[in-house]
């Protein structure tokens, strides 16, 4: 069961946080800021929230990791100050008065079991593996494919399926909600293939990332656009509905160049210069 995460300071992030204070530190802000949505944005939201609370002792920032679709709806209904989405807003969502602000970019890494000999796949091959029209033998491996995907409404899933052209046609062996469950499913099954945020797969044992059309998923290739499977990390708010002073201050700082190093430390690619 998902639980609201109230951000707590961690010793591991102390050095990074100390070097990247939010603007307006100690200006008397107080109150709470609620964020809700993308599980892929967890590291980014946690490190930004921790720094902001370090600088503003009377502010509490909460993060509810419900998935992009739920976060967008939370922003629309006003049950969260800031919705979190790891995909761009759809036209229908914009027509409902929602506004997106891209704070970072993230590559969607394609992962296989560490024992799988396959090292590179094209978008067309990925589509074939996920729709069931090909097995591992067609791309240098052997046996059936156990395609692992995210739940309906996941921004990671929406991004992956849109880019690979597999919307509505994937044949999934497992459909999982948290990113960690996808990593574990691939780690424990030699026939599995999955996808996850770049920041989530780095350094994980038992899995490996494959290149896509010869391009590795790295910060550099995401930023320069050469890696084909990437998506935005988005703050979602309501047009014409002002945030509280505290929430607006957090929003402005998180979307600025002042927060860029923290976003980078969380494994994403900042968009602010």
Can you name each region flagged by the protein language model?
Residues 3-23:
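Sec-dependent N-terminal signal peptides of Gram-positive bacterial secreted proteins and lipoproteins
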Residues 1-3, 56:
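Low-complexity, intrinsically disordered short peptide segments enriched in small/polar/basic residues
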Residues 20-69, 73-273:
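Exported/periplasmic ABC-transporter solute-binding proteins
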């Amino acid at each position: 069961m998902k639980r609201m995460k109230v951000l707590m300071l961690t010793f591991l992030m102390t050095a990074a946080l100390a070097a990247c204070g939010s603007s307006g530190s100690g200006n008397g802000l107080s109150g709470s800021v609620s964020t809700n949505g993308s599980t892929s944005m967890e590291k980014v939201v946690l490190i930004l929230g921790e720094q902001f609370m370090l600088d503003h002792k009377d502010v509490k920032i909460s993060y509810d990791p419900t998935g992009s679709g739920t976060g967008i709806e939370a922003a629309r209904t006003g049950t969260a100050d800031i919705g979190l989405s790891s995909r761009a807003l759809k036209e229908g969502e914009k027509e409902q008065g929602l506004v997106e602000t891209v704070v970072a970019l993230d590559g969607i890494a394609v992962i296989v079991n560490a024992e799988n000999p396959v090292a590179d796949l094209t978008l067309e091959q990925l589509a074939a593996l996920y729709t069931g029209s090909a097995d591992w033998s067609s791309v240098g491996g052997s046996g059936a494919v156990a395609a692992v995907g995210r739940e309906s409404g996941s921004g990671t899933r929406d991004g992956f399926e849109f880019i690979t052209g597999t919307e509505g046609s994937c044949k999934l062996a497992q459909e999982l909600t948290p990113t960690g469950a996808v990593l574990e499913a691939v780690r424990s099954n030699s026939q599995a293939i999955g996808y996850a945020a770049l920041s989530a797969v780095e350094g994980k044992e038992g899995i490996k990332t494959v290149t896509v059309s010869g391009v590795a998923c790295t910060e550099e290739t995401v930023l320069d656009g050469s890696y084909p499977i990437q998506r935005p990390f988005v703050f979602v708010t309501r047009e014409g509905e002002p945030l509280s002073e505290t929430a607006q201050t957090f929003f402005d700082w998180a979307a600025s160049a002042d927060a860029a190093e923290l976003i980078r430390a969380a494994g994403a690619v900042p968009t602010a210069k």
